[in-house]
Amino acid sequence: GTLIVTPLASNVPAAAAALNAEITEMYPLVEVPDLLREVHEWTGFAHQFTHVRTGDAPQNIAAMLAGVLADGTNLGPKRMAGALKGISAHQIGWMRSFHARSETYRAAQACVTDAHTRHPHSQIWGDGTTASSDGQFFRASDRAARRSDINLHYGSEPGSKFYSGLSDQYGYYSILPISPTESEAVYVLDGLFDHDTILEIEELFTDTGGTSDHVFALFCLIGRRFAPRLRNIKDRKFHIFEKADAYPTLANHIGAPINTALIMEHWDELLRLA
């Protein structure tokens, strides 16, 4: 037979969607700088942007937040200073030069995610042990286009790609910049283990781009559950430890048996790798 997986139907009632839209319209309009300041007051994330030499937290929080916003919008210090009051381009540039680094952005992101994880409302969506990861492509323009790569899957325009991990509580635990031409599967385990949040993820969902035989095998070794959403599953072969007749209904989808002798021969090396 042929394996056919029927997509799940939406379980959101129409009334709930209408209520969501109604509530969304009640949200007040907030300026992004004000929102960043409020999030900092809740979490203290701006203190994670420590000085490159002294390790001190930034003294001018407003300039630091303006620098974060300048990075996030690609406006740069001059245009950002022109859009804000009381902050100069020099102040923003100084903060970016001495406080904004990849490791401080990572620490700030973890600070926000941890505060989100500890908030009792986050338990409504999940307990933080399940997550999903996926790549996002962002088209480049102007000068950035000359330093970017092209992946025809996303069209003929150059751009950059970020591989992000999101918990079931909707908190990011990992955001990795990668080349648009690279396989996403290489970064699945990097994001899962190399992060600074308090999340303890036991099950990970990915799309087809995040899967490979190596990822399947390593998840078994590390005791985590890998749950990919595979494209064209009817054309795929599954490799099992049992004999092929153990799954008669899936006979057309069972490939070569797993070579257990080869696994045992290299068991110690596999454990060191995991």
Write out the residue ranges for each language-model feature.
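A generic structural signal for ordered alpha-helices
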Residues: 10-17, 51, 58-59, 70, ...
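Catalytic or ion-translocation cores adjacent to nucleophile or general acid/base/metal-coordination motifs
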Residues: 82-120, 151-268
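Structured nucleic-acid-interacting core domains from mobile-element enzymes and related host factors
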Residues: 110-149
